[in-house]
Amino acid sequence: MPCAAGQNVVGIRYRIPKAGWVRFRWSRQVPQDVKSFRVTMDRAGRWHVAFAAVPDPIPGPGNGEVVGIDRGVAVSAALSTGELLCCPGLPGRQQQRLRRLERRLARAKRGSERRKQVKRAIARLKGRDADIRKDWCEKTSTSLACRFDVIRVEDLKIGSMTRSAKGTAAEPGRNVRQKAGLNREILRSGRGLLVRRLHDKAPGRVEKVRPAYTGQRCSACGHIAAGSRESQALFRCAACGNTLNADVNAARNIAAGHAVTARGGEGVARPVNREPQPVLLPTV
């Protein structure tokens, strides 16, 4: 069924094998070259129809500007331009309700209908939180791809950073609860999804920099000292006295491609997905 741009069609039904008739909202125009689609249901019980289509990459603005992005927990993305971007989450009341439901779930009897209802309510709230995070990553990645020709990020291994600290029975982990809380905040900040969407929207324009010492190096004079970062938010160079936001300082080092190897030498930014974009190919 075709759908015009800007049209919002409600009440469409689709028959899913072994599930019956499911209603869905057709809220956007479907590309003409779509040949397949997939119907899924998430843990919150919501049905989704996903159409397989590859969007065109966003062309660079051609201004030659380079931006560095420092991703963190307190600040989701600090730009070398001085901007501090924070990924939003659930509103305060919904966060409180989520915590109440989680406590109720811990008290509920396993296998009971009440426990199933609480789990569904928790899944709906967490699904809403994930939707907010995805929406922020989509809008932020689109803005960055439109504004800058080159985007540099740290080469972070999110899977290793969020690995469980429980350990084994023979060698139990330490500070397990604190590490679990940190893992949740890292995943909630959307740092991995943001970079993946940048790769998709700006192929050939995303570069990765070694993360070593980007937070301890002064972006003004290049001096490296652990004591220069006085707090999570404040960086004051022990050599030149340069003072600025610590995350912005790290982002400027990333933008310049400045990293330090284990032997003390300069790290080099390495390109990722450096295929030429069709819009940048020379005309014959």
Task: Label each residue range with its predicted role.
Residues 1-14:
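Hydrophobic alpha-helical hairpins/lids featuring a short glycine-rich hinge
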Residues 10, 17-20, 32:
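"…together with the soluble PPM/PP2C metallo-phosphatase catalytic core" -> "…together
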Residues 14, 21, 45-48:
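Trp/Tyr-centric glycan-recognition "aromatic platform" motifs on solvent-exposed beta-strand/loop surfaces
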Residues 20-28:
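Beta-strand/loop nucleic-acid-binding surfaces
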Residues 28-35, 41-284:
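Positively charged, helix-rich recognition surfaces that bind polyanionic ligands
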